[in-house]
Structure formats: C-alpha cells, structure tokens
Design a protein with these regions (language model features):
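Secreted/periplasmic proteins
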Residues: 2-6, 17-128
Length: 128
C-alpha cells in the first residue's frame, strides 16, 4: 500500500498542473480581444477616489474598469447603436453589476452616448 501513495500523489500533482491556465500578463498579448455587452459610467461621487491600480479617478480622463484586462490596456469602446467610439485606458476593476462588461469615466461615456441613458450596448476591443 505504501508504494502506491507516492504514485497517486505524483499523478495528482501532474493532473493539477496540466489543468491550470495562465492569463496574458501584458496588454499586448490581449491585443484583438473583443467583447460585446453593456457599458455604464462612474457616478460623480467617485471623483478623486483611488482606482484598483492606485491612480485617482478623474471624470475628465478617458479611463475604464474591466474585470480581467491588464491595467494599462488601451481599449476601443464602440457604441453599437451609433458607431461612435472612444479609446480608454484600463486602470480599475469592475463593473460588478450583472450584464455589464465595462465601466467608463464620465467623459469617455459622454463622447459615445448620452449619460441620461445610464448604460449602453458597446463592443470593446483591446488595441494594445
């Protein structure tokens, strides 16, 4: 029975490492990644608060939050209904509302849609 334990342990370690995945570490390796879904924008109360990467949120800068894209990634966000687009830099994590794929700064959102709508359908594409 004792000789089987090391064999089972080795098989388990091999299985676990074979099933693991790694995500790209830099924005460039995500280039071409695309996703379609709802975008919203930051409320005014978040002005001058720290983002997940330590920067201060400024509503007049073209920045955004995404759940998994690396910080510093440049992303083209296109409003599906009117074709307008804006390039933003990922510097925060979120959104944490079901169905939303990106949170935009207020100025970025305003450049492609009307803030009174609250959320719009967008396509996002990592450009670098």
């Amino acid at each position: 029975m004792k000789p089987i334990l090391p064999l089972l342990l080795s098989a388990l370690i091999l299985f676990v490492t074979a099933c693991s995945t790694t995500q790209p570490k830099s924005g460039g390796s995500w280039a071409g990644y695309a996703e379609t879904g709802q975008a919203s924008y930051y409320a005014d109360k978040y002005e001058n608060r720290k983002t997940a990467n330590g920067e201060l949120y400024k509503h007049n800068l073209n920045t955004a939050a995404h759940k998994k894209l690396p910080f510093g990634s440049n992303v083209r966000v296109t409003n599906v209904s009117n074709g307008k687009s804006v390039v933003v830099k990922i510097n925060d994590r979120g959104p944490f509302v079901k169905g939303r794929i990106i949170d935009l700064s207020k100025s970025a959102f305003s450049s492609i849609g009307n803030t009174t709508s609250g959320a719009i359908k967008v396509k996002i594409e990592v450009i670098r």
